[in-house]
Amino acid sequence: MRPQSLRQSGRTTAVRRGCPCDLHFVTRRSLGVRRGRSVKELVEVPLSYDEALDKVTGPGQLFEVVGTEVDGHPVRVFKNAPANLGALFAGARGDEAEFIVYEAERWTFAETMRNVDALASALVTTYGIRKGDRVGIAMRNLPEWIVSFAAVLSIGAVSVSLNAWWTEAELDYAIEDSGLALLIADPERVERAHAPAHSRGIPIIMVRGDQLDPNPTGVRRYDEVVNLGDPMPVVEVDPDDDATILYTSGTTGFPKGAVSTHRAVVNGLMAFWCSSTIQTARKGEDLMGGGGFAPCFILIVPLFHVTGCVPVMLSCFGMKFKLVMMHRWNPDTALRLIESERVTAFVGVPTQSWDMLESPSFSKYDTSSLATIGGGGAPAPTKLVDRVEKGFTRGRPNIGYGMTETNAFGPGHSGDDYVTHPTSTGRARTSIMDIEIRDESGKPVPTGTRGEIWMRGPNVIRCYWNKPEATAETIVDGWLASGDLGRIDDEGFLYIEDRAKDMVLRAGENVYCAEVESAIYEHPDVYEAAVFGVPNERLGEEVACVVLRQPGSDLDADGLRDFLSKSLAPFKVPSRIAFADDQLPRNASGKILKRKLREVYFDEGS
């Protein structure tokens, strides 16, 4: 059943009311001007990036930045940031403007918050969820994902986002590792996660559960639990209380739970809004809307990923923007929705921009409402930047360099800067983050010199859940070691050139080679294996491997993929497989030379 009191059709319009968390007029307020004046009118001459940054974050502005300490380390934070995410959600209560569009359903902000309040009440009164308890969310992109997330955080519990692609074994690990008190899931994830949850006595709330009848033991349907009209429980939530755990692939073969506080998520979110305001102040380019169109995002990436959750979903929640949700990716469906809903912002991975441009139906749809076509989570070919710039009527290319560990925020690129510096990921100087390039000993290197990228800011995670050693290796004196190698040029642009971590970035999904290699070695016919990434114009990178078989084995690529599909999510299974005749090449210390294997087996002509 769907949640109660849903609008199945029709549109709702409403006057947007201001509140401490309503940043709909963020650009004008941040520059300290009347609501009736535009940024273009305010800025008589173009501003440099540094001038705009200083102006937007200066004293008295909405995005004023001040110094403070977090865990004993100095950071810059937004002075006017909400104290917690519950305060941000509360700003939507009673607002009858349209929020979520999902297939035939249209949810207002007020309807969403009625469900949030009622679910939060049920979590506390029916399930005994208390501040600090972990509640898992395992489902595809559905309105109930957003409701569940907001309800959990509003009562001071911790939202644990579980990857909807995961197998039962992968879900089992995360359920055990996070110590869930409750799981909220859709029917497909209930079937996959029921055994791991039930064996530990963890109850499940199932959304849209018409497909499962009767309910499995320990599972109750959403409509049986939620009573619309129940009030939001009152819980004191501090900025430094834990808010979210998002799992990111682990170098040891197990995913790591990245723990963010309310302060981290809120400041990361406001940093995105600040960056948009800076761009508008510089050149009058409104990255959220403009052109006579109301701001509207299309959600084309999973909510269990940090990109879908923070810069897309939470931006719409906080800024009172319409959010058009796609249950699964389809380029023609996306184009149809962009035209019919007048979508202004598209944030995904380069694969998805490429898919739309390559669609035979592309020219049939009106995409003139799009102001920005954003990318991230995978390398973007220079060719794609040029195609986006030329292929869309008004939309400008945009890219960001962020991580789960930074709540997706980091140096970003858009418009002219991106077109003129297409191989860069953006300017290293940001509103709240410090960026340094360091050598192997941890010392900063001169401008233009390559080294590991280190980042510091209030948006950085607190720790990896239950992994103190991994935390100590990655976060040092408040600085996050990214595992990426890069350089900063004399203009202040950051370039990502390689990875210190053994990882493949496939269409926004982090795939750690050690995890895949470990699974490959479980096959009895495998003697030796190496996993690495190879370039793919559509995906950014794809997973490849070279395998040396045991003597006499006739194992082939399809057989290996079938074996791996039983233990790995589909995106982790290598799409390119080669078999070696001799032992894999190694250096003097015994490390397999993956770069050489890539050149020999998967060069551009292969």
Enumerate the language-model features and the residues they cover.
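ANL superfamily adenylate-forming
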Residues: V66-T68, A104, E188-P239, F254, ...
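AMP-binding/adenylate-forming catalytic core of the ANL superfamily
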Residues: W166, D172, L183, F346, ...
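Conserved AMP-binding/adenylate-forming core of the ANL superfamily
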Residues: V77-A87, E96-A150, T167-D172
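Conserved AMP-binding/adenylation subdomain of ANL enzymes
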Residues: V266-C296, F304-T344, S359
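Conserved AMP-binding A3 loop
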Residues: T108-A110, A243-A271
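Gly/Ser/Thr-rich phosphate-binding loop
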Residues: G318-M319, S340-G348, L357-T420, T430, ...
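Conserved pre-ATP/AMP-binding loop-to-beta segment of ANL
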Residues: E98, G229-Y247, F254, M288-C296
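Conserved ATP/PPi-binding loop(s) of AMP-dependent carboxylate-activating enzymes
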Residues: R427-I432, K443-T474, E509-V511
